[in-house]
């Protein structure tokens, strides 16, 4: 379905009925998925039924299966858990139970089932599907349904969404709930860090994941933990000595805390469990450190879903409905999943098979294979963790020196990138300098050499510890060149926003005049606006979306209490509408006005009328987002006046400008990890380039590929020369000419009930799992 026109789509679901249920352990984001499936189903003209209490409700029927309308799923996107309930069900594992379930579905004409749950729930759904024909035959012979009914509903379609905080399902990069669980873990680690530092303590943290170490691995990366235990990679024999040596070493270097992260399913080489108690006693006996154990438990399943989980679930929920509509008796039951930032469909049983293979490999002690089978994302995380945790200060120095600076406005994750870049540089033997206050600081010679321990504890700090300025190098080129010569700098790593990219472009264009600028340069895009060309995501935008989303959740709550109130919220981002659009999806906004999607007075009129209609229903609140520069005349004040006067007597209006709140507090797990990875990746690339351009005792780099922007593009991390990106950049509005996230706007409008054409909806292709699906961290 590359494109379908609106009228046709409005009826593609006509006469079809979709049932949606959540099963197994709950996960944050399930509600967003239920909401998206329900609304997309209604949008295409199908009937949608909510099945309460998972498979138990399916078997028992009656009041547990209710037809939903548009408002049934209003105001649930921000809630954790699942509002339709979930239960582990014994009855469904028996044939009688499944026969009862089939009867309950046929009674309501439901032949499409969307199951949101873990691998057990999805396997159950597939068994149900394969038995469907024979179950109906049994119902006919029992006289419960007629032959004709069995003919009409002869086929059951299944689409699965994986809801599991463990991220233990093969074929999908991220499962629903994983990112939120990481948020909970990082909140706890940040809180524990302060108490551990006060008392010089060691903490052993036990995180969930019986058979899968994903949460433990990623939180260890994002917190800079000293030691990690995961089931996929049991420690070598004699690990007790290595661990105690490492802990003693970091203490003697001046660290006041040690963090050890252990997955609940951690084992040693012989398959014997390693318990958090055992690790604690070991540290106390061998080192005499004051040690505490904290078991995180079900805290990890709780709380509000993160922005990533809300958007992921919404996207996958819509895709699941499309998959059900396009299913035929010959297509396999599918799982809708994410690969990079693209939705794909995978055959359900291939995924389940792969997931079983991992467990089998672990049982048979083929641990390296288990890590490979987990998929690209897991393996990359593991490799980068090993690289960072085993890095040492190099004994041998190279002749190279590099400088790191922050440019633009503060963005979360900058410090994580600086930390990993500094340590990677030092471990490769380079001399590493940091520059305070951006290009201006480079001109004023605010340059200092940095040591391993100077960046300790930077990972979880928000903002910019180096200090950052927006000034471009053009004004003081002479001074900058003089200081590059003075410190003999061979490479520049610039971490920052649009100014960082523009600044490096100016330096490259001045190479003809100054030989000193013929050095290796790399830009790590870091800005809440996500407006730097050469990457799909810039560092700090995930934190910004979460910050804006939390504010909007509170604003929505205020509007719900006041009744008949519309809030107009202004987001940052310059001309780039990324923040407004993505936050809009995450909070279920009624509209988001952005510069890239031009709107006129007709559109505004339609939106106000939509709002007036909405106030006649039981949802008496509205939320409209507006990017700060979406229109020169239709300002926030103009919108406020328009909505106020048009809504007179129906609703009243308030405005809220979020401002610098959006820069966020502590970085989100995504930004910590993304920053860490880009820092390492950039240094590896710069070292290779330096060795390649080193001639007769000096560095001379003037090729276009020696000054690049590093970024995530679809599924791979790529380096794009700044000179080549120039043609793809709209300098007047400071953003890329092409933006991938514009297709998300369709989702925003559909889920807010606008009559729009689906001609632009591109559905996910069916892929196969055996082609090791690459992922967000590919290439590390």
UniProtKB/Swiss-Prot annotation:
Entry keyword Phosphoprotein: yes
Record's comment on post-translational modification: GlcNAcylation at Ser-529 by OGT decreases enzyme activity, leading to redirect glucose flux through the oxidative pentose phosphate pathway. Glycosylation is stimulated by both hypoxia and glucose deprivation.
Keyword set, alphabetical order: Acetylation, Allosteric enzyme, ATP-binding, Cytoplasm, Glycolysis, Glycoprotein, Kinase, Magnesium, Metal-binding, Nucleotide-binding, Phosphoprotein, Transferase
Compartment(s): Cytoplasm
GO molecular function: 6-phosphofructokinase activity; ATP binding; fructose binding; fructose-6-phosphate binding; identical protein binding; kinase binding; metal ion binding
Binding site for substrate: 164-166, 201, 208-210, 264, 292, 298-301
Glycosylation site residues: 529
PTM annotation (Phosphotyrosine): residues: 640
Start and end residues of each stretch annotated as Interdomain linker: 391-400
Entry-annotated residues carrying N-acetylalanine: 2
Listed name of the protein: ATP-dependent 6-phosphofructokinase, liver type
Native source organism of the sequence: Bos taurus
